[in-house]
A protein has these predicted regions:
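Phosphate-binding loop of NTP-binding sites
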Residues: 4, 59-62, 71-228
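N-terminal leader/targeting and accessory segments in enzymes
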Residues: 1-92, 96, 217
Length: 228
């Protein structure tokens, strides 16, 4: 049976995912359709992780038990559609890494203000003496920190693209700041973007917390029909 995890995209999240996958005992293959930046190539070589650039070895990737994709890669690209047709598990870095940590996870999203809010939250927790990591759409790779650090908390800035790659993650604290039209080149409609943002509290239990802006009209309207 295959033990191969293929990583699509060799940027910060992809290389971090590769390092974690290797640590967890998987065979790892990193594939990037473009050119890999020198610092990421050097990191892959440091860990002895196999990679390719300038294209995809489709046959090899489709032999994977799992594909971890970078957030900028849409689910509609041909290789991912082929993988989905073959029932290969496809997920993002956050989903992949969350399975290997017991830390408290704080996720923050919103069309505007999420970076500032994430940085401030991380700063406050750090000043309180907590062992906290900063990751997601800001800071260093979440997966690499899970592989090499031992943080008790993670503050994650989550874009809609990252949320789309999360299927089972239960955030201990999910924060939704606001929603205004954005990334409509990626989504079929504004409603699709709204639903992507609301993925932040999918799968939360009654012991976990969903914090949102009650003054945001889009959020208020979506809450009427939203089921956790």
């Amino acid at each position: 049976m295959s033990n191969l995890v293929s990583i699509l995209g060799a940027g910060e999240s992809g290389v971090g995912s590769a390092i974690l996958a290797q640590k967890e005992g998987f065979d790892v293959w990193v594939s990037d359709s473009g050119q890999i930046k020198p610092q990421y190539k050097a990191e892959l070589e440091k860990y002895g992780i196999a990679y390719e650039e300038g294209g995809h070895d489709v046959e090899k990737i489709l032999s994977s038990v799992k594909i971890v994709k970078s957030p900028g890669i849409a689910d509609t690209v041909p290789i991912l559609k082929q993988a989905a047709d073959q029932n290969i598990q496809i997920e993002g870095e956050i989903e992949f890494a969350a399975a290997y940590t017991n830390a408290v996870l704080i996720g923050i999203t919103g069309t505007n203000g999420k970076t500032t809010t994430t940085l401030l939250t991380h700063h406050l927790l750090q000043k309180a003496g907590l062992k906290v990591g900063l990751a997601g759409n800001v800071g260093y790779s979440f997966a690499k920190q899970v592989a090499e650090e031992n943080h008790e908390y993670y503050v994650l800035e989550l874009s809609s693209f990252q949320l789309d790659g999360m299927h089972t993650v239960r955030l201990d604290y999910a924060v939704l700041l606001n929603i205004t039209p954005d990334h409509l080149d990626r989504y079929d409609s504004f409603q699709g973007y709204i639903e992507s943002k609301f993925r932040i509290n999918n799968h939360q239990t009654s012991a976990q917390r969903f914090i949102y802006c009650a003054d945001d009209e889009v959020i208020k309207n979506q809450l009427k029909n939203h089921n956790n």
